[in-house]
Each structure stands twice: as structure tokens, then as C-alpha cells.
Design a protein with these regions (language model features):
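Acidic, low-complexity central loop/insert segments
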Residues: 96, 101-144, 164
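Short, glycine/charge-rich beta-strand/loop segments that flank catalytic centers
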Residues: 78-87, 107-109, 141-147
């Protein structure tokens, strides 16, 4: 990694071209609930919080607090953070809980403080850390909840932010499931002095970043009480992102109004229901099925390429896995 500017690009940053199959297709404004028009209760039912996890509690404890605070039946988080680690923890609520699956291919970003066990010239630190970009082989730590099998993970970029003696502050963009503690251990071995992780903070989980949407638990308590006790929903609404935020990075297939109810009732997506698609979809890709109002209908696996979806007139294009939209948002038209 040269000392010039590092291109910080995760899979979530890939721009996709939209290919149109039916230019005349329209959507009925009377049907559905676009993200920006959902009533507050509904917004919460189909929402996801970009939560700033504090160091101390486990990710599961944080989610349990959110459930109790909002009196929810279900909630889930995207990517466990160890108790001592702080930062971006997407927490999906109620009907949106299963959408965290969509964050797996999006990539994550961390800022870590590595403490070296000996003096190393700065040029060597830069050169050695550069070698850890790309495919690496890792074994989960002893305390990990998963089996300790060797596995490959991708490091998209490493950017050194500051070197102060034996302390190296750096930013890393990585594939989901990459252990930063293990990465630092192996960097230390490669430098010939050893190293350990002193601090870690997650700064991105796919489309969720350290930006104006990031909220603390204290913020949530205040905003929730503003809404419930004073009737001021503005702050609480901004603290909860629509579930569609969690699929921003996924390739998408947009469908006509007449196909929505069939999918919400359990049907796979057939070609006649498609209006437009993202370019570059491959068979087996995880895709988001959307309405023409950009509402998330479902997640599924593509059984055709983008080209086949455009060219064919029949057949199943998406094997639907998880449905998020309620069955009564669009009428049955079959």
C-alpha cells in the first residue's frame, strides 16, 4: 500500500446500470406504501436502525435492549461485534428482521489500533501491510462461535492512518467473516516482531456508515420518548431507516403491480412480471425484488442472467426465498 490515497471501495459501492424491459409499465399510486410515506408504526415494523454499539455489551444484549425499549416481538442484527468492539451495528426490527441476510455480500470496514511488539521501520510496515490486500487464509479465533476451519476471506483495502512508534492506526475494508484480530496477528508475524489488537471500531456495514443516520442507544431512548410522550415523531423517524436501505447494494429486479401479490403469496418470480433489471445479474446471485415505487417485496436467487430476463418471454427468473411485503399491500390480479 503506497502512501498515496487508497481507493476505499467495498462491494456495496458498485454502481449498476438499469436495463428496461417494458418502458410503458406504470404503478398505481393507490397501492403499496413507499418508504417515505409509511406511517410511523409501519415505518418501525419495516425498519432498520444504524446503531452505534458502545464497547461493553454483547451485540445480542444491545438488540435485547432495543426490543425491550420499543416493546418489539422480533429484532436482529447484521454482523456480531465482540463486547469490547464499538461501531456500526445494523439492527433490523420486526418484519424487517430477516433483511440482515442482504448485508453479507456488502463488505465491512473497520478502524483498528495495532500494537507492535517491537520497533519496525515505517517503510516496512507499509510494504508488508500492502501484501495483506486481496485473498487471505484465516482460521477463526479460539473464542469464536464457529468451527475453526481454515477459510479464505477478501481484504478489499488497507489504509494506514497514523504510525506512532509501535502503534499503527489503520482502516481496512473486508469481506464479511474476516477476523481483524487474526489479521493483525498475522501482520505482526510477517513483520517479524508480533502484534496484537489494542482497539477496534466498525465504521461500515455495507450501506450503513458513520454518517448522519448513526444513532446511539441514548439517542434512541430520547427520540422514542419524544414520539410516545410528546407526539414528536421527526427524530425517531430519522433514527429508523426503511428496510430498503439494507438492499441498496444488491442487484435488483423491478416488477409490475400485477405481479406483486403473486410473489407475496409465495410464487417465484416469472419473466412476464419483470419491468426492468440491473445489468450484470448472474445465475445464483442474491437479488432484491422491488416494486416500481422502490418498495422491497422479496429476496431471492436469480435463475437467469440479466440478458435472459430481458430476452425471454416466459420461465422463472427469480427463486424467491424471503418475502417482506405484506400480502394486502397490492391486490390479487391473477
Amino acid at each position: 500500500m503506497a502512501r498515496d490515497e487508497v481507493r476505499r471501495i467495498l462491494p456495496a459501492d458498485i454502481k449498476r446500470e438499469v436495463l428496461i424491459k417494458d418502458e410503458k409499465a406504470e404503478t398505481n399510486p393507490k397501492w403499496g406504501f413507499p418508504p417515505e410515506k409509511r406511517p410511523m408504526e409501519m415505518h418501525m415494523q419495516f425498519g432498520i436502525i444504524n446503531l452505534d454499539k458502545p464497547p461493553g455489551p454483547t451485540s445480542h444484549e444491545v438488540v435485547a435492549w432495543v426490543k425491550k425499549l420499543f416493546n418489539l416481538n422480533k429484532a436482529g442484527h447484521g454482523g456480531t461485534l465482540d463486547p469490547k468492539v464499538s461501531g456500526v451495528l445494523p439492527v433490523a426490527l420486526e418484519r424487517a428482521t430477516r433483511v440482515v441476510q442482504a448485508l453479507l455480500p456488502a463488505g465491512k470496514e473497520y478502524v483498528a489500533l495495532m500494537h507492535l511488539h517491537g520497533e519496525v521501520p515505517e517503510d516496512k510496515i507499509y510494504a508488508v501491510m500492502k501484501e495483506f490486500e486481496g485473498e487471505i487464509i484465516q482460521r477463526p479465533p479460539l473464542r469464536s462461535a464457529v468451527k475453526r476451519r481454515l477459510r479464505t476471506r477478501k481484504v478489499y483495502y488497507i489504509e494506514i492512518l497514523e504510525i506512532d512508534g509501535k502503534d499503527v492506526l489503520f482502516r481496512a475494508g473486508v469481506e464479511a467473516g474476516t477476523y481483524i484480530r487474526s489479521l493483525i496477528h498475522h501482520i505482526g508475524l510477517a513483520l517479524g516482531v508480533g502484534a496484537h489488537m489494542a482497539e477496534l471500531r466498525r465504521t461500515r456495514s455495507g450501506p450503513f456508515k458513520e454518517d448522519e443516520t448513526l444513532v446511539t442507544l441514548h439517542d434512541l431512548v430520547d427520540y422514542y420518548h419524544f414520539w410516545k410522550e410528546d407526539g414528536i415523531e421527526e427524530y425517531f423517524r430519522k433514527a429508523i431507516q426503511p428496510m430498503e436501505k439494507a438492499v441498496e447494494h444488491l442487484p435488483k429486479v423491478w416488477i409490475r403491480d400485477s405481479a406483486v401479490a403473486a410473489v407475496t403469496h409465495g410464487a417465484d418470480l416469472a419473466v412476464p412480471g419483470i419491468v426492468k433489471v440491473h445489468k450484470g445479474i448472474k445465475k445464483g446471485d442474491l437479488v432484491a425484488v422491488m416494486t416500481l415505487k422502490d418498495e422491497l417485496v422479496a429476496l431471492g436467487k436469480a435463475t437467469m442472467t440479466s440478458g435472459e430476463m430481458l430476452q425471454k418471454s416466459k420461465g422463472i427468473a427469480v427463486d424467491v426465498d424471503k418475502v417482506f411485503m405484506p400480502r394486502d399491500w397490492y391486490p390479487k390480479l391473477w
